[in-house]
Amino acid sequence: MTQPAVPPDTYARATAYTDVFDRIDALLEGETDWIAAMATVACELHHTFDYYDWTGFYRAVSDDLLVVGPYQGSHGCLRIPFDRGVCGAAARTRETQFVPDVEEAADHIACSSSTRSEVVVPVTTPDGQLLAVLDIDSDTLDAFTETDTQMLEQLATRLGEQFASTEQR
């Protein structure tokens, strides 16, 4: 089995993110439904990057619980408390979690045994309310770079601003 293609350099990654963000912006222009937005973002990201093997959102449904939202890939964990796993850590701390090797992360929850690396970015409103976390898993060890993290954080900020008034949790 061949490994998924990982863009070789920072410029290629940044360009790919810029292109997908342009598509996402066009698709979400005027959109007010948070669930539809999450589904669209997950789909666009997942089909743009070959090294993304699970791409989706866990919605913040209370002050201490995430529930799986729209995603692409195999099944996800259904519920994740804030005190468990990489997604829980991102929700709890409101900070991006960058995990080059999930085998080295003591708190990693193995929703899929094939996952080797992960990045999780909180999606918060400008006033700090957590809407969701964006979770990206790869079956490739050390698949993500600082460029991935920075670009996903930019996307999360934009989503948090656009959907700050959503009633859907």
What kind of region is each of these model predictions?
Residues L141-D148:
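A short acidic/glycine-rich loop-to-helix N-cap element
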Residues T124-S138:
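Sensory-domain boundary capping and coupling elements
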Residues S117-T125:
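A short, aliphatic-rich beta-strand micro-motif
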Residues M1-H75, Q154, R158-R169:
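Intrinsically disordered, low-complexity terminal regulatory regions
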Residues A60-S113:
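Regulatory sensory and allosteric helical modules in signal-transduction proteins
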Residues S74, S138-D139:
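A short acidic/small-residue loop/turn micro-motif
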